[in-house]
Amino acid sequence: MINLELFKEFLLNLIKDYGYFGIFLVGFSEPIFQPFPTEIFIIAGILLGLDWKLVWLISTIACNFGAVVTYYLAKKYGEKLMLKLFDEEKIKKGSHYLKKWGILGVIIASFTPIPFEVICWVCGSFEMPFERYMIAVFLSRLIRHGMVILPFVLKDHIHF
C-alpha cells in the first residue's frame, strides 16, 4: 500500500524542484491514478512563484493528455481493471452520473466529491464517444483549474 502522505510530499517536491514540468506530471497523472486533486499542486506552484497563466495552460493540457491515456486503458481493460483501482461504490456513483448526464455529467463531476479519475475510467469503460469525452474533459479542467487560479489573479485587483 502506498503511503499517501509520503506520496503527497513527493508530488509537492516535484512542483518545487521542477516547476512547470512538475505541474505537467501531476496534471497528467490525475485522470489516470492520482489520489490528490491537481488543484492542490496548482496552488503550490503559484505560491512558489510560477506564472498563473502557464500553470493554468499546462495543468489543463496535461490533464487532457492523461485523460486520453485513461480512456484507452479503460476501454481496453474495462471494468476488471477499474475494480482493482477503485472501490465498487465509487464506480457505481461514477456510472450513475455518466448514464444520467452524459457529456454534462463529466463536467458536473468536476464539482462533486467523485474523484475525476473515476469518471475518466467510467467513460472509457462504458465507451462514451471519444470526441464528446474530450470536450467534456477539456471544459471541466479549464473551468475547475480556472476557478482555483482566479483568487490569485484577482488578489491584486480587489482592495478592501
Swiss-Prot record:
Protein name, as recorded: Uncharacterized protein MJ0201
Among the Pfam families in the record, one is VTT_dom
What the entry lists under PANTHER family is as follows: ALKALINE PHOSPHATASE LIKE PROTEIN, INNER MEMBRANE PROTEIN YQAA
**InterPro entries from the xrefs?**
DedA_domain, VTT_dom
Give the species this sequence originates from. Answer: Methanocaldococcus jannaschii (strain ATCC 43067 / DSM 2661 / JAL-1 / JCM 10045 / NBRC 100440) (Methanococcus jannaschii)
